[in-house]
A protein has these predicted regions:
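Non-catalytic, topology-defining segments of multipass membrane proteins
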Residues: 1-82, 89, 115-249, 311-359
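Long helical/loop segments within the catalytic core of UDP-sugar-dependent glycosyltransferases
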Residues: 81, 291-300
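Conserved, well-structured beta-alpha core segment at the onset of a catalytic domain
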Residues: 84-88, 104-107
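Histidine-centered catalytic micro-motifs
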Residues: 86-96, 126-138, 258-267, 299-313
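Transmembrane helix-loop junctions in multipass membrane proteins, especially transporters and channels
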Residues: 92-96, 100, 213, 217-224, ...
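Juxtamembrane helix-capping/reentrant segments at transmembrane boundaries
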Residues: 98-118, 145-154, 272-289
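Transmembrane alpha-helix/helix-exit interface in multi-pass inner-membrane proteins
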Residues: 170-172, 252-269
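Active/binding-pocket-proximal capping segment
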Residues: 264-277, 321-326
Length: 359
């Protein structure tokens, strides 16, 4: 980039730079769709195939593990990755990117992505809090991000909120209810449909209790032999943990750590909420984040693109990321701003101009 061009970009407002980024994203999307016309022609079918293929893959891995064909670690890793595809599908469905003229098919796909990720709120409720997130990202009434620790100072409480849904409900729930009560009251979707999440949590905490008990016996040098009546329960919990509980927890923990830290929460200098697309997110594509990205489909490196253009399927966002990332950097979106994580995700500005430095 020439010095003159860099100077012109620096002189742009956030709105102007955001508009440039949107143009580049849409340009890259058009190039892909023109080169591969099937992407547009079969977009609905692609979404359905990914949904059913991912769910079917999780079932297949479970069967292979139960049949003692694949080890536990392989089942956990592959199922966790497949569950991350289902999360991306839910996200696309929230923005009606597939079967927008068929509520029946959309609802069927919503059911699939929910049943195979039972530790989440139902997708109809999440749709409303996610669309709210796009309107108020970086504000105190951003229910979706604050619930997973965005804006919290680093410490034990934040770690617990990122990793444990019950801790999130206990620690963040009262604050969010206070700060976003009008928005929560406007939500029409039912919060509870079937007790899927509660059932998941019952199984999950039972497994954790069993594991801690076994660990305690091991540390004490005592052989852990469950009574005969408990043995089938232990076997069931261990199997459920490998095929469903741990993969779902891994996926959820990974995306909550990444998402809560790639979104900014307020402007540290002006103590104001963020209303600029350029300042809402950063790009996390450091190798340090790779283990987490394995279970959240490279979320930190590409989700910022979605904030600029919401009507792009996740696989096209990934496909076009190498092209679009250059525009994000050029127009001032920050990269790997780990310093913000030590400042409760506050957006730090440089000097009086308040323009982002490009890392």
């Amino acid at each position: 980039m020439t010095a003159a061009k860099a100077k012109r970009i620096t002189a742009m407002s956030d709105k102007e730079r955001g508009s440039k980024i949107i143009q580049w994203i849409r340009f890259g999307d058009r190039l892909l769709r023109r080169r591969h016309t099937w992407l547009t022609r079969f977009q609905d079918q692609i979404g359905l195939a990914i949904t059913l293929g991912s769910a079917g893959g999780m079932i297949a891995m479970s069967a292979l593990y139960i049949a003692d064909i694949v080890p536990a670690w392989a089942c956990i890793v592959v199922s966790g990755i497949l569950a991350s595809f289902l999360h991306e599908m839910e996200h696309d469905l929230i923005h009606s990117l597939y079967y927008k003229n068929s509520a029946q098919v959309q609802n069927f796909m919503f059911w699939v992505v929910w049943l195979f990720r039972g530790n989440t709120v139902n997708p109809w409720f999440r749709k409303e809090i996610h669309l709210l997130h796009h309107r108020v990202s970086g504000h105190k009434n951003d229910v979706e991000e604050r619930y997973i620790s965005n804006g919290m100072p680093w410490g034990l409480k934040r770690i617990l909120v990122m990793l444990d849904p019950l801790a999130a409900l206990t620690i963040q729930g009262p604050k969010i209810k206070r700060d976003a009560l009008p928005e929560l009251r406007r939500i029409k979707a039912p919060h509870k449909i079937i007790p899927l999440q509660r059932t998941f949590m019952l199984l999950w905490y039972s497994f954790l209790l069993l594991s801690l008990t076994r660990l305690g016996f091991l540390v004490a040098g005592i052989d852990f032999t469950p009574p005969a009546w408990l043995a089938p329960v232990v076997t069931f919990l261990n199997t459920a943990a490998v095929v469903y509980l741990i993969p779902c927890w891994l996926r959820q923990a990974a995306i909550q750590i990444v998402s809560s830290n790639m979104h900014y929460y307020g402007d540290a200098v002006n103590a104001q909420p963020i209303d600029s697309l350029v300042r809402q997110t950063q790009v996390l594509n450091s190798w340090l984040v790779l283990p987490l990205h394995l279970f959240c489909f490279n979320f930190g490196a590409t989700h910022g693109i979605h904030h600029f253009v919401v009507n792009q399927p996740f696989y096209l966002r990934q496909w076009g990321a190498p092209f679009v990332t250059k525009a994000l950097r050029r127009y001032g979106v920050r990269f790997n701003d780990f310093a913000s994580m030590r400042q409760a995700n506050a957006y730090q500005t440089n000097g009086e101009t308040g323009l982002a430095s490009v890392h």
